[in-house]
Swiss-Prot record:
Source species of the chain: Dictyostelium discoideum
Protein name according to UniProt: Uncharacterized protein DDB_G0273701/DDB_G0273221
């Protein structure tokens, strides 16, 4: 009798847990240090992580940004397409606007590393899923693949990317300079040559330091390094 009661209790717990899951369909995009201003792994809602990170396991999910209207900070999500768990820890203006305008589910996932790295933008594009399933408040037992989206040591992407070519001097991302610095220092911060930085910012006077808070173009039309 005790065994039967235990089995019934376990079954009820599993049933309640499965009912707690919510499955929705949305867009999954990606971001890296070079998409932040200034480039870093800083996050808006530190919790499990103090900065963006994660392995994709239930215990150590990967940082994502989303609209807080449908995914509150600290909530976990599982994406079967990549066999990875994620946790809401960052803000995403585009995600917020899309939810407010048409109720679109959109998560922007971190690929790392914590410093700006060449090749991340092409990798982000290759990884993007325009429509995939999100399991909110998932069980802890789903299959997991901890292969990194982007390997900061080798520069390898989980999916083979196509190389994006910037269109002339069109600006893809802007950033407010965090402190007064030279054009050379700003270019280095964004992994640009000084010549390329000047071409993207033709109105800057590079004979003197850029003032703190000045908005500058940090990348070409591809959006990052």
């Amino acid at each position: 009798m005790k065994l039967l009661k235990s089995l019934l209790f376990l079954a009820s717990v599993l049933f309640i847990s499965s009912q707690a899951e919510k499955k929705v369909t949305g867009e999954l995009t990606f971001y890296a240090a070079g998409d932040n201003c200034p480039p870093s792994g800083e996050i808006a809602y530190p919790g499990l992580h103090s900065s963006a990170g994660g392995l994709g396991t239930y215990a150590n999910p990967i940082t994502v940004a989303a609209s807080t209207a449908w995914l509150s900070a600290g909530k976990k999500v599982y994406v079967a397409a990549y066999k990875k768990y994620f946790i809401m820890e960052d803000s995403c203006e585009e995600c917020e606007n899309e939810w407010d305008s048409n109720g679109k589910y959109h998560m922007d996932a971190w690929i790392g590393p914590s410093t700006i790295h060449s090749g991340t933008t092409n990798c982000e594009v290759a990884l993007t899923l325009s429509s995939t399933q999100f399991i909110i408040d998932p069980l802890s037992t789903y299959a997991v693949d901890t292969t990194a989206f982007f390997n900061g040591t080798t520069g390898a992407c989980l999916k083979t990317p196509d190389n994006c070519v910037d269109q002339g001097n069109e600006c893809g991302n802007t950033c407010q300079i965090p402190s007064s610095m030279s054009c050379s220092s700003a270019a280095s911060m964004f992994l640009l040559s000084e010549t390329r930085f000047k071409a993207l910012n033709p109105n800057l006077d590079c004979t003197k330091n850029i003032a703190k808070g000045k908005s500058v173009c940090q990348s070409g039309s591809c959006g990052g390094p």
